[in-house]
């Protein structure tokens, strides 16, 4: 099988993530796409207001009707700081005989040389770069494949900010995820009592 790996915080998962998974399926003739939520990513902080379980629940809701998309919680189970090279090692043990593709956005690719053991990553899997910010292709000495995907200008941080400021997000998220966010009061601004006086 041809399997694409999409790692991320998914805080929250949004239609841009799902659209990219569908694009990858089509452009690379992928049999399965695996979403891997990170535990504690090395390159960003996750607010303690949203739990790992919240993020996994939202992934499950968003992807419940997608038969070619799976969720793997290997990074969550391993705990600690998440490094992609370790994630790849874990996934390779499960899918020994399959061809693996690691998909990252060009925003991450521009600093790929600063990742932990990048050479080991590109030796283990095919590195796929998706357009996220830049329309042009970035150059790198690391072996990689660029896909000509459509850029969907949505980010999880933008969604969190919009929710915190009471702005609409219904067109950016699957309905089930939006309902979960509302039901669990996620991403809302915490108002200090002193600010009300």
UniProtKB/Swiss-Prot annotation:
It catalyses: nicotinate beta-D-ribonucleotide + ATP + H(+) = deamido-NAD(+) + diphosphate. InterPro entries: Cyt_trans-like, NadD/NMNAT, Rossmann-like_a/b/a_fold. One of its GO terms (biological process) is NAD biosynthetic process. Disulfide bonds: none annotated. Signal peptide: none annotated. One of its GO terms (molecular function) is nicotinate-nucleotide adenylyltransferase activity. The keyword Transferase applies. Its EC number is 2.7.7.18. Keywords: ATP-binding, NAD, Nucleotide-binding, Nucleotidyltransferase, Pyridine nucleotide biosynthesis, Transferase. It comes from the Bacteria. The keyword Nucleus does not apply. Pathway: Cofactor biosynthesis; NAD(+) biosynthesis; deamido-NAD(+) from nicotinate D-ribonucleotide: step 1/1. Belongs to the NadD family. Catalyzes the reversible adenylation of nicotinate mononucleotide (NaMN) to nicotinic acid adenine dinucleotide (NaAD). This is Probable nicotinate-nucleotide adenylyltransferase. It comes from Borrelia garinii subsp. bavariensis (strain ATCC BAA-2496 / DSM 23469 / PBi). The gene is nadD.
């Amino acid at each position: 099988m041809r399997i694409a790996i999409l790692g991320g915080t998914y805080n929250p998962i949004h239609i841009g993530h799902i659209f990219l998974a569908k694009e990858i399926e089509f452009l690379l003739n992928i049999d399965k796409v695996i979403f891997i939520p990170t535990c504690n990513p090395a390159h960003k902080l996750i607010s303690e207001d949203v739990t790992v379980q919240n993020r996994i629940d939202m992934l499950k809701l968003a992807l419940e009707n997608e038969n070619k998309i799976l969720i793997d919680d290997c990074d969550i189970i391993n705990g600690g700081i998440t490094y992609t090279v370790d994630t790849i090692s874990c996934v390779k043990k499960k899918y020994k005989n399959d061809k693996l593709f690691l998909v990252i956005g060009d925003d991450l690719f521009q600093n790929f040389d600063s990742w932990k053991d990048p050479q080991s990553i590109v030796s283990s899997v095919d590195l796929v770069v998706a357009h996220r910010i830049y329309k042009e292709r970035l150059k790198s000495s690391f072996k990689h494949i660029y896909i000509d995907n459509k850029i969907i200008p949505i980010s999880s941080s933008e969604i969190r900010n919009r929710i915190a400021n009471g702005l609409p997000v219904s067109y950016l998220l699957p309905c089930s995820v939006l309902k979960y966010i509302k039901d669990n009061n996620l991403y809302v601004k915490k108002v200090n009592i002193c600010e009300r006086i």
